[in-house]
């Protein structure tokens, strides 16, 4: 189709309509480029690998700068993810680069759950983006996208095979992120061992079903180079920020007693291949794959968990509005059911409480009757005792009165006899001599 042609949808097909002159929509690519350049780009790299494999050094070498960061130790109690964001600019293109490092990965005795913090971190970035998408007022053009676009998995240069930790971790990550395996510190093993090691790694990845990122070959402009580079995976890399004079040029290299290893010499390592594939050729594809494949998978699973689906049980198309109405009706039904259950529960509890109160009231009445009867019995006993005491008091008073009366009568009789005797003595003097 010519550049000045236009395709218009008509029914199920379309027809090509020639233009009589220049319209101007051929500038759309330029408009898109200008808009993208003005907004800037973001790229997020996750570096996974054991401590001491040169992850930070390789990042410095890849972007030809010195990133500030604290060196990790082997004494971490668990795996921690450390994220640092940098603003870079090359020509008029701005890049917001985020580098996430797995501090303490592989340093623990028990490495069984070492992959979990990494998976949780990746999911957390997906969740943050999903929540931003679900907002009523979205501002995705200003939102800092923190989703991981590529995972550089650093493999220790043992020269034998992949560790179980590496296989398990990559298997857990392959459905969530684009994985590019790389052999770190490739100058630690010989060239023949390195070739065998690459073959062994590829074989183990295939046999264990680990899906690593394949450079796309559907674009004719990069199909050939990407197809060639896919055959070189995993890349064997060396990192160095030190510049040495080799011949008449200053080159990044490592100096050893036996010679010099040049970082950007493809005969020495695959650093240049990695940089070309990661940054110059496939950076945008990595960003696109993250959004269209990994994020969409996470989003679909999350929406399905929430009850949203594209089809009904009969595999018929199901619109979002229908899904919403179905979920709303389902929710209202559940709400009514819960309300009815709560009402029944409330009524049951009221009945139980009423029964308890009636039983308590009955017990109180019985207790009151017992106490009342006991009170009456005690009152009767006290009244009987009081009556008895009153009778005793009255009898005592009567006896006292009689005794006083007898005493007074005795006193009067004794006085009369004394007067009579005195009178007789007076009349009869002989009685005095007696």
From Swiss-Prot:
GTP binds at residues 49-56, 104, 185-193, 239, 254. Residues 184-187 are annotated as: G4 motif. It comes from the Eukaryota. Pfam families: Septin (PF00735). InterPro entries: G_SEPTIN_dom, P-loop_NTPase, Septin. Residues 407-417 have a biased composition (Low complexity). The modification N6-acetyllysine is found at residue 367. Widely expressed. The modification Phosphothreonine is found at residue 418. One of its GO terms (biological process) is spermatogenesis. The modification N-acetylalanine is found at residue 2. Residues 101-104 are annotated as: G3 motif. Residues 321-409 form a coiled coil. GO terms for cellular component: axon terminus; cell division site; cleavage furrow; kinetochore; microtubule cytoskeleton; midbody; septin collar; septin complex. Keywords: Acetylation, Cell cycle, Cell division, Cell projection, Centromere, Chromosome, Cilium, Coiled coil, Cytoplasm, Cytoskeleton, Differentiation, Flagellum, GTP-binding, Host-virus interaction, Kinetochore, Nucleotide-binding, Phosphoprotein, Spermatogenesis. Its main location: cytoplasm. The modification Phosphoserine is found at residues 27, 416. Residues 405-434 are annotated as: Disordered. Coordinated expression with SEPTIN2 and SEPTIN7. Filament-forming cytoskeletal GTPase. Required for normal organization of the actin cytoskeleton. Involved in cytokinesis. May play a role in HCV RNA replication. Forms a filamentous structure with SEPTIN12, SEPTIN6, SEPTIN2 and probably SEPTIN4 at the sperm annulus which is required for the structural integrity and motility of the sperm tail during postmeiotic differentiation. Belongs to the TRAFAC class TrmE-Era-EngA-EngB-Septin-like GTPase superfamily. Septin GTPase family. PANTHER family: SEPTIN. Septins polymerize into heterooligomeric protein complexes that form filaments, and associate with cellular membranes, actin filaments and microtubules. GTPase activity is required for filament formation. Filaments are assembled from asymmetrical heterotrimers, composed of SEPTIN2, SEPTIN6 and SEPTIN7 that associate head-to-head to form a hexameric unit. Within the trimer, directly interacts with SEPTIN2 and SEPTIN7. Also interacts with SEPTIN9 and SEPTIN12. Interaction with SEPTIN12 alters filament structure. (Microbial infection) Interacts with HCV NS5B. This is Septin-6. It comes from Homo sapiens.
